[in-house]
């Protein structure tokens, strides 16, 4: 089936190319219902400490069962305090402070900067954009630049890379950013250059130039 082919592709990329795949989890007003250890939860009705710990455990299971490399928590809607509680729970398992530090713990956000309390527990914090622009890029106060990843939305500009190259070139005034990215990356397969993923490949070379021996 197509699912088996996709799973085999993921494993090949993990094992041969070093690509890491993470689960998308919500800290927003979606996907609030889940079951763990035979108990049903609905975070839209109750986000007490027990429910938050259960949500973290459910996420961990979703990551480990298929062999993913971590989780990206999409923060768009929850309060800052609820996000911190979830990340502290997830941080017991994944990320720099977790039982399995090789598993990535990432938070992504759009408008308001997340609370700095999450920093020790996270490998990366991703700043998203929903437009084809670069001028707004800023390093958020008190966040380590090496943990920050800046992502834009291709929209209809996937054929020439949109602002991806500018994102790759941009650096904060102090330090070096953790990286950049786009949504959806797959669209750049149809690069107007005729080379699949041409602009994305160039962005990688800008940030991590190949070494000539």
Residue ranges of each PLM-predicted region?
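Chitinase-like catalytic core of GlcNAc-active glycosidases
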Residues: 2-167, 174-177, 185-206
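C-terminal domain-boundary segment and adjacent tail
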Residues: 205-213
């Amino acid at each position: 089936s197509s699912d088996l082919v996709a799973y085999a592709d993921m494993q090949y990329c993990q094992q041969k190319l070093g690509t890491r795949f993470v689960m998308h989890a919500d800290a927003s007003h979606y996907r609030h219902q889940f079951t763990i250890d035979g108990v049903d939860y609905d975070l839209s009705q109750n986000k007490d400490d027990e429910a938050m710990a259960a949500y973290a455990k459910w996420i961990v299971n979703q990551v480990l069962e298929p062999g993913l490399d971590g989780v990206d928590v999409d923060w768009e809607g929850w309060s800052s305090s609820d996000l911190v509680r979830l990340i502290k729970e997830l941080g017991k398992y994944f990320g720099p402070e977790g039982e399995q530090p090789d598993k990535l713990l990432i938070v992504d956000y759009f408008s308001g900067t997340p609370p700095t309390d999450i920093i020790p527990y996270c490998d990366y914090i991703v700043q998203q954009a929903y437009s084809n622009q670069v001028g707004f890029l800023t390093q958020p106060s008190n966040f380590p630049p090496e943990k920050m990843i800046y992502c834009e939305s291709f929209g209809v500009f996937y054929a020439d890379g949109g602002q991806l190259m500018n994102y790759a070139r941009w650096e904060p005034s102090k330090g070096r950013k953790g990286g950049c990215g786009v949504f959806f990356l797959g669209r750049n397969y149809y690069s107007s250059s005729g080379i699949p993923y041409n602009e994305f490949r160039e962005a990688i070379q800008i940030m991590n130039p190949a070494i000539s021996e």
